[in-house]
């Protein structure tokens, strides 16, 4: 059990008034502000699911079990850093419009000088408020509003890892996006987080500044951006035979190639997220047949094939529920292949409460440039219509499994199905 998190000394170290608001930065950097305001960085504290998870699950859990308080306070080290550094814990709810609502603001990133942990984890940033702001670029002119100092640390993935790696009180890596990057091909090639999430483009950095051809845009687009998710994985499906008779067996093979992410997919809040492969055949008369994935036989595979299972029983602790049986684990059609890594509580039940995670299950996510191959063995029904049979493979993605979202009354957009990709093939059914 890890009872001390890396940055406990940050708690209450500063005051709200030590930091500028993002709106003040907007007066000189309007474009950058608008980019940031559309990204999850600006909503890390105010986003509806984060608010529900924190105030309905995390805070009540820490009241039931005081051991959890340090970790639950620590959520704010990355979701509401100004509140954490101001010692206002838990912070006021978003509706109260406190400085906690600044979320991950301009100041939070541009006052960071280095990491205090290796690997970086749990808000391990060294930060000092003041007139000096740090940039990855050597300034050509100085701002009248503040001093600019170049700092290469802002260009590293370790900078991002301060918050995109997380270890819970039990020593479990419950978020490891930067570590996944480091272990993969993008890390070995030096293709940083910034290349995908802060791409370079021609842009005017400040109203009184020059236009650069290679400015880092502050888009921060990720899992909540359907346009970013779309196309992450390439799909191809093919049959083993093209002509088949009713009653005959056809094997469809699907290749899923991660051609877009430098980390695993899904990543981040992995306890919440699923991607799943759904294969459906439609015969010449429009009859539809759902195909179930072939089992491979690896340990923990049962968590990667959708079915009728209850999970997330530990929500009963913060919600103070008696005889709570849990909710459906997956909430999708049975027999689909799921790309996920399950998180388990002390009782061995799956959990979406990362602070309560005691162990991790099989990691069946898709790594960077990895190709997963899945097979679907389909015995054609005798009543299948002769003619062309179309077969569609689609990879879907959900930020939060729908049964949990419905149970906690999370706004529907958090469990909306995002289509990652699809591919079609066909066979001919003989009379």
Label each region the model flagged.
Residues 68-79:
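Hydrophobic alpha-helical transmembrane segments
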Residues 1-16, 32-67, 87-358, 362-368, ...:
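Primarily the internal scaffold of c-type cytochrome electron-transfer domains
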Residues 387-391:
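Exposed beta-strand face motif in extracellular beta-rich ectodomains
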Residues 18-22:
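An acidic-aromatic substrate-binding cleft motif
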Residues 77, 81-88:
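Conserved, well-structured interaction surfaces
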């Amino acid at each position: 059990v890890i009872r001390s998190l890396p940055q406990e000394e940050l708690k209450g170290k500063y005051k709200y008034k030590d930091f500028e608001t993002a709106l003040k930065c907007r007066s000189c950097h309007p474009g950058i502000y608008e980019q940031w305001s559309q990204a999850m960085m600006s909503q890390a504290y105010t986003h509806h699911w984060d608010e529900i998870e924190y105030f309905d699950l995390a805070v009540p859990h820490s009241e039931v079990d005081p051991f959890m308080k340090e970790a639950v306070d620590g959520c704010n080290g990355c979701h509401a850093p100004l509140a954490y550094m101001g010692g206002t814990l838990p912070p006021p709810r978003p509706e109260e419009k406190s400085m906690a609502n600044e979320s991950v603001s301009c100041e939070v990133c541009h006052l960071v000088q280095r990491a205090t942990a290796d690997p970086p984890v749990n808000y391990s940033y060294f930060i000092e408020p003041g007139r000096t702001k740090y940039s990855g670029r050597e300034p050509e002119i100085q701002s009248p509003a503040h001093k600019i100092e170049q700092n290469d640390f802002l260009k590293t993935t370790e900078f991002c890892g301060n918050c995109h790696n997380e270890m819970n009180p039990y020593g479990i890596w419950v978020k490891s996006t930067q570590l996944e990057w480091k272990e993969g091909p993008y890390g070995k090639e030096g293709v940083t987080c910034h290349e995908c999430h802060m791409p370079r483009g021609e842009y005017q950095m400040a109203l009184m500044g020059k236009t650069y051809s290679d400015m880092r845009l502050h888009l921060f687009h990720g899992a909540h951006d359907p346009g970013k998710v779309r196309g992450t994985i390439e799909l191809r499906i093919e049959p083993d035979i093209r002509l088949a008779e009713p009653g005959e067996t056809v094997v469809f093979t699907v290749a899923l190639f991660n051609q877009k992410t430098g980390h695993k997919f899904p990543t981040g809040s992995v306890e919440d997220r699923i991607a799943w492969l759904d294969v459906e055949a439609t015969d010449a008369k429009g009859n539809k047949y759902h195909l179930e994935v072939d089992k491979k036989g690896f340990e923990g595979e049962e968590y990667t094939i959708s079915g009728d299972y209850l999970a997330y029983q530990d929500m009963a602790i913060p919600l103070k529920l008696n005889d709570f049986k849990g909710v459906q684990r997956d909430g999708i059609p049975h027999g689909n292949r799921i790309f996920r890594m399950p998180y388990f509580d002390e009782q061995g039940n799956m959990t979406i409460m990362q602070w309560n995670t005691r162990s991790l299950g099989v990691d069946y996510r898709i790594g960077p440039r990895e190709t997963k191959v899945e097979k679907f063995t389909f015995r054609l029904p005798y009543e299948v219509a002769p003619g062309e049979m179309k077969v569609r493979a689609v990879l879907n993605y959900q930020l939060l499994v729908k049964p949990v979202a419905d149970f906690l009354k999370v706004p529907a957009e958090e469990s909306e199905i995002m289509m990652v990709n699809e591919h079609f093939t066909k066979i001919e059914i003989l009379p």
